[in-house]
Swiss-Prot record:
Family: Belongs to the universal ribosomal protein uL4 family.
Complexes and interactors: Part of the 50S ribosomal subunit.
Keyword Ribosomal protein attributed: yes
Lineage, highest ranks first: Bacteria, Pseudomonadati, Pseudomonadota, Alphaproteobacteria, Rickettsiales
Protein name: Large ribosomal subunit protein uL4
Pfam families: Ribosomal_L4
Its biological purpose: One of the primary rRNA binding proteins, this protein initially binds near the 5'-end of the 23S rRNA. It is important during the early stages of 50S assembly. It makes multiple contacts with different domains of the 23S rRNA in the assembled 50S subunit and ribosome. Forms part of the polypeptide exit tunnel.
A Gene Ontology biological process term: translation
Sorted UniProt keywords: Ribonucleoprotein, Ribosomal protein, RNA-binding, rRNA-binding
């Protein structure tokens, strides 16, 4: 399929052919969600923990005699129903990770890229060379693509991200810049618009079409 390649001034430079097996697939939200859940699960530290009756500090003495007080019988001040007692069925330290096959992870990335292209939210530019590391310069250029604090931009460069572009982008809210090897479904779907250089698009083609 043919797509237009722009420069950062939003001028059309040329048209290129992109592999439809990477950029023109049917939308599969189920697979995209599976991989996003996998990404977020790997981020969780899993250090949440509560104390059971055995972990609570305190006496093991019976609080009062079994019969004759008129109260409900109690065996321990550390029981779950007592104030300051243990927690029943609370969270424990564990890993939230689960396995997703590499093939499915690659498919999810292709589906995410295809979806953004289908809704005209994937922009291919010739390069990210802005000639300056000033944030104001980059912000004025991106305004031509309707960038604002409320519309996130996810920029994908080839192996080596342009240094000036990277430095200028650091102070911009809701704008992330990565090399193409770091492209992932979560960031693509999270941001409103995806901007990818032509060389990065070709590298993604080679990596994902295998």
């Amino acid at each position: 399929m043919k797509v237009k390649v722009y420069n950062l001034l939003q001028e059309i430079e040329k048209e290129v052919e992109l592999n439809p097996s990477v950029f023109c697939l049917k939308y599969r939200p189920d697979i995209i969600k599976l991989v996003i859940d996998w990404q977020l699960a790997k981020r969780m530290s899993g250090t949440h923990c509560t104390k059971t009756i055995s972990g609570v500090s305190g006496t093991t003495k019976k609080p009062f005699k079994q019969k004759g007080t008129g109260n409900a019988r109690q065996g321990s001040l550390r029981s779950v129903q007592m104030r300051g007692g243990g927690i029943s069925h609370g969270p424990v330290v564990r890993s939230h990770e689960f396995d997703v096959p590499k093939k499915i992870r690659k498919q999810a990335l292709k589906y995410a890229l295809s979806y953004k292209l289908s809704v005209n939210k994937l922009i291919v530019v010739d390069d990210f060379n802005i000639g300056s590391n000033k944030t104001a310069v980059l912000k004025n250029l991106l305004k031509k693509y309707n960038y604002s604090n409320y519309s996130g931009f996810f920029c994908i460069d080839d192996q080596n991200v342009d240094r000036n572009f990277f430095l200028a982008s650091r102070n911009l809210f809701n704008l992330n810049v990565v090399a193409q090897i770091g492209a992932n479904p979560y960031d693509i779907m999270k941001h409103d618009c995806v901007m990818v250089t032509l060389s990065a698009a070709k590298s993604l083609e080679m990596r994902l079409a295998e």
